[in-house]
From Swiss-Prot:
It catalyses: Fe(II)-heme o + 2 A + H2O = Fe(II)-heme a + 2 AH2. One of its GO terms (molecular function) is oxidoreductase activity, acting on NAD(P)H, heme protein as acceptor. Pfam families: COX15-CtaA. This is Heme A synthase 1. The keyword Membrane applies. GO terms for biological process: heme A biosynthetic process. It comes from Acidiphilium cryptum (strain JF-5). Coiled coil: none annotated. Interacts with CtaB. The gene is ctaA1. Pathway: Porphyrin-containing compound metabolism; heme A biosynthesis; heme A from heme O: step 1/1.
Length: 358
């Protein structure tokens, strides 16, 4: 690859890293809006024209009037003032505008890079596919809001929030991997580390699955059902964990079961990631990769401590920090896995042994 082509790929990779940062920003904004209960406060859906918040007192009163008609307001917020409504409205509004900005930051550079021949047909198709997934992600978010406009539910459904978050993490994973590959196109050959590479792949899948279960806990209000650790009020498996019918409904809607699932998944994930980090720190992976494994070890330890603290305290705000650190943990695991993409199963024989074998 020529120097100019390599610089072009690095530039495209840097742009995709910006998109990854913006996806993380969506998690920051969306998680904050959910934590403060702002998911249903905006009762209009204007993806192209709603880029400016209400600017006059009359406009604010109209927006507040729409919210007053919702079941959430009538059941949970009947004494809310206009000032309180504004404090909820603006974080949700900024989250929506951040999504609009992300679409612009993605599509405009994509068109420019394409017109200048900086990206291939294959990469263009791949990025458009990821954009399509992002559009599906936005549609899923819209539907959760739409439910609050048209039905009597009081908060976004965990059955939508869980897949919504998982899809976001899958997009984040694919985007980050693509960015890292463009910035570092030549994998380092690392003999004998194929098992570690596979363990990191498993770790990525476990982290994403655990994040999805965490979203179920947050959306269903399961955080405060049991606030002891490691047992759940003295029980390994909580009573009534399988009380709902049909049986499968317990794993999605039973608060005790949902919290139990997340506890088990988090513990298994932490063990697997710690093993992967320990193997990486002992392996001949190079200084840069070693730093990544150190970061991975630190983040998984912090994540488990945050999870335990969130459970014991019952604080949704601490759970929000736990959620953000989960994305950082996922990013670190992806970076470690990417650094080992040139790992092979066999360790090559020394030259003299190869000659003797001949």
């Amino acid at each position: 690859m020529s120097g100019a082509a390599a610089r072009g790929d690095r530039l495209v990779g840097t742009w995709l890293l910006v998109i990854c940062f913006m996806i993380f920003g969506m998690v920051v904004g969306g998680g904050h809006a959910r934590t403060i209960g702002a998911g249903f406060v905006i009762q209009t859906w204007q993806p192209f024209t709603g880029i400016v918040p209400p600017l006059t007192h009359a406009a604010w009163e109209r927006a507040f009037g729409l919210y007053k008609a919702t079941a959430q307001y009538q059941a949970m917020q009947p004494k809310m003032t206009l000032a309180q409504f504004q404090s909820l409205y603006l974080p949700m509004f900024l989250d929506r505008d951040w999504g609009r900005l992300m679409a612009v930051v993605f599509l405009v550079p994509l068109a420019v890079f394409r017109l200048r021949g900086r990206i291939s047909n294959r990469l263009t198709a791949w990025l458009l596919f990821l954009f399509g997934l992002g559009a599906g992600e936005a549609t899923m978010g819209w539907y959760m809001t739409y439910e609050g406009m048209t039905s009597r539910i009081l908060q976004p459904s965990p059955l939508y929030l869980g897949p919504h978050f998982v899809l976001a993490m899958l997009i984040f994973t694919a985007m980050l991997w693509t960015a890292l590959t463009l910035r570092n196109p030549e994998p380092a050959i690392l003999p004998g580390l194929a098992r570690l590479r596979g363990l990191l792949s498993v770790s990525i899948g476990l982290i994403i699955a655990t994040i999805g279960l965490g979203a179920l806990v947050a959306a269903s209000g399961a955080l405060k059902v049991y606030n002891t650790f490691p047992l759940m009020d003295g029980h390994a498996l909580p009573p009534h964990a399988l009380a709902m019918h049909p049986l499968w409904l317990n794993f999605l809607a039973n608060k005790a079961t949902v919290q139990f699932e997340h506890r088990v998944a988090a513990t298994v994930t932490a063990i697997v990631v710690v093993i992967a980090a320990a193997m990486g720190l002992r392996a001949p992976v190079g200084a840069k990769a070693r730093d990544l494994f150190l970061l991975l070890a630190g983040l998984v330890s912090l994540q488990y401590i945050l999870g335990m603290s969130t459970l014991v305290s019952g604080m949704a705000e601490l759970g929000y920090v736990h959620e953000l650190n989960a994305v950082l943990l996922l990013a670190a695991c992806i970076a470690c896995r990417h650094a080992l993409r040139g790992a092979t199963a066999a360790v090559p024989l020394p030259v003299y042994e190869m000659k003797a074998a001949e």
